[in-house]
Every structure is written in structure tokens, then in C-alpha cells.
Amino acid sequence: MRIGIDLGGTKTEVIALGDAGEQLYRHRLPTPRDDYRQTIETIATLVDMAEQATGQRGTVGMGIPGSISPYTGVVKNANSTWLNGQPFDKDLSARLQREVRLANDANCLAVSEAVDGAAAGAQTVFAVIIGTGCGAGVAFNGRAHIGGNGTAGEWGHNPLPWMDEDELRYREEVPCYCGKQGCIETFISGTGFAMDYRRLSGHALKGSEIIRLVEESDPVAELALRRYELRLAKSLAHVVNILDPDVIVLGGGMSNVDRLYQTVGQLIKQFVFGGECETPVRKAKHGDSSGVRGAAWLWPQE
């Protein structure tokens, strides 16, 4: 049995999968924000609940909104900031009395979709989480690729490519929380989409409300979405030029905008070197379960 844990900002979730990937158990508990030791205890409780419910002992994989530095062995770049600077995998392994495999939550999405999701069987998968922020992960042959520095997939903190004059102005107006300017995340996260609509219309709306206006043929909402589609396509074309994945998978709140799957693939061709690109852009099959399923699959079938 494989147990996966997904640590989110508000909830921590466990899933137990059987040998064929079937769900045996799933449960959520509130994430104890700003309390490192209680976070470990919450995870231990969830693992115990899964094992009690199934009557089996499982391997444990963990997805977090950050990564482990290969140089210091502690968590870095986590927006769950109380994890930063902590040897989280070692402390969790000691508490659970077994090895715990840990990966960035976007890498878990990539693994999940590569194993039995929208990119099942693909050799190279690039998976994107587009929600409040913007992260990405890479899977090779169903296994997470973290890179030599532990930063593979940190796509959202590269500059938006091929900026037009308006985007150059926006870059100066809205710096990224990472301290740099012009990051992809500031443009194509759900937050960035809503902010661009506000710049165009003068009204603050949620992403879902803007999409509803698009469906009602509102011209300003339509313009905001077209700008978003082009920015997403430019950003993904950079990935194709460097990595050339077999499949691109979208997860997170913006992945529910169905029109993206008709438009973005064609727009990518305008920016890929040589103009040829048939890389499919697909919606995550497992939805909000992908991260926790991918954490479980950090222990692959041998």
C-alpha cells in the first residue's frame, strides 16, 4: 500500500492507494499553520488513520509547497513558511519510523498525471499548477525530476518571455513576491489574471466571475482572457524550446477554463523555434486529487 500526504495552506490530506492505484482511503485535517511540531503530529495522525482503516502498513510520500535543498538538507522556498529551514523529511521519517519521500507539490502533480492520469505513459511530462500562484513540475518516466539544485520546474519565477510594451510597464508596477520583476507568476496565476482584468476594467472580480462574463460576451473580459491565453502560450513555448515535453498538463483553478485547451496549443506555435509544435495541453485527470496521488506514487512500482 502507498500512502500520500499533501500539505496545503489550509488543509493536509492523506490518501492510501492499492497496488493498481485504486483509492483505499482518503481524509483531510486542518493544517496547523505556523506550528512545525504540530504539523508533523497532524501528518502522523493521518498516516495512522489510513493504516487503521485499511489494516495495512504503507510507504509514505509527501508533497509540500517547497523543496529540500540538496546542499543544506532543509526546506527552502516554501510558502508554508514555518517549514523553511527545517529538516522536514528527516524529522518526519523519525516520527513515522520509516523513510518518507518528499517532493514539491507540482512535481507530485506531474508524477500523478504521468502514472495514470492525463499523461499516462508519456516519457516527459511538464505539469503546471495555476491558482493563487503558479508552480510547475517535471516527471521523467513517471518519476519526479528535481534537478541538481532542487529547483527543477520553478517555471513561474522566470521572466515572461517576449514582453510587449504594456507587459513591460506592468513588470515595473507589480513586482513579484520573490523580489524580482516580470515573473511569469505575476502574469498567468489566477491572481495575475484577475489583476489584469482590474487594470482593464477598473473592477475587481474573481477569476471565475471574469470567465462568466466571457461566456456572456463581455468585451473587456474577453480581452483579458485573450491576453491571458497569449501570455500562457508564450510561457509554455519557452518550456517546449528547452524541455520539449511529450505532454503539458494544467492543474489548479485556471485549469478549469475549458477554452484554454482549444486556444493555447495553437498559440504556442507562434513562439516555438521553427513554428512546429503538436505538444498536447491537457487538463489534469485527477483534479485536486492529483497532488496527493502523486505523493503516494513517489514510491513507484519497481
Swiss-Prot record:
Positions annotated to bind ATP: 4-11, 133-140
Catalytic EC class: transferase
Keyword Kinase applies: yes
Catalytic activity: D-fructose + ATP = D-fructose 6-phosphate + ADP + H(+)
Domain of life: Bacteria
Enzyme Commission identifier(s): 2.7.1.4
Keyword Transferase among UniProt keywords: yes
Single GO MF descriptor: fructokinase activity
InterPro entries in UniProt: ATPase_NBD, ROK, ROK_cs
Coiled-coil stretches noted in the UniProt entry, renumbered to this chain: none
Transmembrane segments: none
Assigned keywords, A-Z: ATP-binding, Carbohydrate metabolism, Kinase, Nucleotide-binding, Transferase
Single GO cellular component term: cytosol
UniProt xrefs under Pfam families: ROK
Family: Belongs to the ROK (NagC/XylR) family.
NCBIfam families the record matches: PRK09557.1 (NF007108)
Role description: Catalyzes the phosphorylation of fructose to fructose-6-P. Also has low level glucokinase activity in vitro. Is not able to phosphorylate D-ribose, D-mannitol, D-sorbitol, inositol, and L-threonine.
This protein's name: Fructokinase
